Amino acid sequence: MTRLVLCPGSRSGPLAAAAGLLAARGDLALTTAIDERSAAFLALGMATAGGRAVAVVTTSGTAVANLLPAAVEADRSTQPLLLLTADRPARLKNCGANQTVNQEQFLQPVCRWLGHGAPEGLASQPPQALFDLAHEAWRHCHGRPPGPVQLNLPFEEPLHGAPEDQLSLQVSGLQRSAPAPSSDSPLGAAPQLDPNQAGVVVAGPWRGLAPALPAYQQALLQWLARSGWPLLADPLAAIPADCPGQLDGWELQLDRLQLAPGSPVLRLGPLPASRRLEAWLQRQTGPQLLISEGEPRGLDPLGLADQWSGGLAAWWAEQNQDFPGASTPEQLMPQSGIASLLRQRLPLQGAVNEPALAHWLPLLLPPQLPVMLAASSPVRDWLIWGGLQAQNRRCFSFRGASGIDGTLSLAMGLAMEQGPMVLVTGDLALLHDSNGWLHGAQGNPPLLVLLIDNQGGGIFQQLPIQSKQFDRLFAMPQRVNPLALAAAHGIDGRQVACLEDLPEALEWGLAQGRPALLRLATDREADARLRTQLRSAAQNAEPLL
């Protein structure tokens, strides 16, 4: 473990002192945070970018309960997260002692493993027992599948001895080792697909550990080159740039994608955020194979696919390489004029609107710059309107549980770990996690936040909801000045008045090299109408071929 996020508290004092000393020695990158909920999301962002667990330290009581939202997301997005929660010793439990609750039960349903220190306090445990506890926690964090682990650690007083005394166990002598092999039951043989048979690949959000991504991408390239199958890719699929077989604007023209009866579908990871794709998959008559990156739990709410959890790289390695050379199958859907249509209908001029932002941002941002999309309208808009440029960019979104809580903190964590980053978010998601701005004071993470301010929950405007109290019951607009709120945290920001100003505003924001905010005000009612109009035009568009 090389990163730790520390939250304030007295009962966690021994852990804080030890972390501080390790950081002073250069053995640990230490970040502090006053809000446990935000801190856990920050750590999850770091862990996702780095592909290894980041620890969060909290005191006892309600502090532990605040870890639950991030733990739920880590569980469902299969990312490692180590939660170190200080606790009272057993003698203070169930007797009315202050700040003493049943915190060992708060996170258990979503954790891969719950480890306990000695009930009478950690000081009573021999060093080897603590080493074994730490090793077991790390193993479960990175098991099959990865996920959150809680170590509930009782501490007896005195809590605040000299820092050197807290390290009397010589933690620095604990060897860093790779996670122990998982004890899960072995996988069955990888299902075989015939690359000479016409089929299609549907690539959903990538859910693996970062170090495994290159092998996944290479396997995808090899299968596509071997089979010639077209690729329906989510921007979150982390496909390699210029991946062959990509279909531009596929979500808008699924009705034109006609498979021969019995044609197979290779699905990678969970479903993209498209109800139209779900309906299309339900119309197919051929076998559907779903490959997950180590996730044994079901990822097919449609109940149509056979799932194999060994990962795409392992699946490709087990495919029959003796098939005769395949010619590229007949094109299943002619490349349409969607890109030209959207360029005409969404010019880079006039009032800011959400489809235009989703179309132009992938074109205007530097190609290698990663983007995080809030798990609401942005992730859906980029799928629909972003085109090939969105598919070929490394995009993140935390859709394990698809909550909007923790959006800013997650993006800060990504930027701290991997460098320059852009967050595209709505106003409610940003406001919900406004404490995330506090992380900008530590190390100046290079994060540019693009705030689509549509005065409330714009995603609900796209649903068939008819209510005279729509704003009050669903959109819930808030009377907050986001630029002023950011400025109160020392964050510079600008208002983007029109689409013509967007390129210069992006250039300014990216040049800051630290957290910055661009506010883009939109009209959610007008944008909902525009989306409907664009879909209708896409259905009537003539194909290029």
Curated annotation (Swiss-Prot):
<dbReference type="GO" id="GO:0009234">
    <property type="term" value="P:menaquinone biosynthetic process"/>
</dbReference>
<dbReference type="GO" id="GO:0042372">
    <property type="term" value="P:phylloquinone biosynthetic process"/>
</dbReference>
<dbReference type="Pfam" id="PF02775">
    <property type="entry name" value="TPP_enzyme_C"/>
</dbReference>
<dbReference type="InterPro" id="IPR012001">
    <property type="entry name" value="Thiamin_PyroP_enz_TPP-bd_dom"/>
</dbReference>
<comment type="function">
    <text>Catalyzes the thiamine diphosphate-dependent decarboxylation of 2-oxoglutarate and the subsequent addition of the resulting succinic semialdehyde-thiamine pyrophosphate anion to isochorismate to yield 2-succinyl-5-enolpyruvyl-6-hydroxy-3-cyclohexene-1-carboxylate (SEPHCHC).</text>
</comment>
<dbReference type="GO" id="GO:0030145">
    <property type="term" value="F:manganese ion binding"/>
</dbReference>
<protein>
    <recommendedName>
        <fullName>2-succinyl-5-enolpyruvyl-6-hydroxy-3-cyclohexene-1-carboxylate synthase</fullName>
        <ecNumber>2.2.1.9</ecNumber>
    </recommendedName>
</protein>
<dbReference type="GO" id="GO:0030976">
    <property type="term" value="F:thiamine pyrophosphate binding"/>
</dbReference>
<feature type="compositionally biased region" description="Polar residues">
    <location>
        <begin position="170"/>
        <end position="185"/>
    </location>
</feature>
<comment type="pathway">
    <text>Cofactor biosynthesis; phylloquinone biosynthesis.</text>
</comment>
<dbReference type="GO" id="GO:0000287">
    <property type="term" value="F:magnesium ion binding"/>
</dbReference>
<keyword id="KW-0464">Manganese</keyword>
<dbReference type="Pfam" id="PF02776">
    <property type="entry name" value="TPP_enzyme_N"/>
</dbReference>
<keyword id="KW-0786">Thiamine pyrophosphate</keyword>
<keyword id="KW-0479">Metal-binding</keyword>
<comment type="subunit">
    <text>Homodimer.</text>
</comment>
<keyword id="KW-0460">Magnesium</keyword>
<dbReference type="InterPro" id="IPR004433">
    <property type="entry name" value="MenaQ_synth_MenD"/>
</dbReference>
<dbReference type="InterPro" id="IPR029061">
    <property type="entry name" value="THDP-binding"/>
</dbReference>
<dbReference type="InterPro" id="IPR011766">
    <property type="entry name" value="TPP_enzyme_TPP-bd"/>
</dbReference>
<feature type="region of interest" description="Disordered">
    <location>
        <begin position="170"/>
        <end position="193"/>
    </location>
</feature>
<comment type="pathway">
    <text>Quinol/quinone metabolism; 1,4-dihydroxy-2-naphthoate biosynthesis; 1,4-dihydroxy-2-naphthoate from chorismate: step 2/7.</text>
</comment>
<dbReference type="GO" id="GO:0070204">
    <property type="term" value="F:2-succinyl-5-enolpyruvyl-6-hydroxy-3-cyclohexene-1-carboxylic-acid synthase activity"/>
</dbReference>
<comment type="similarity">
    <text>Belongs to the TPP enzyme family. MenD subfamily.</text>
</comment>
<keyword id="KW-0808">Transferase</keyword>
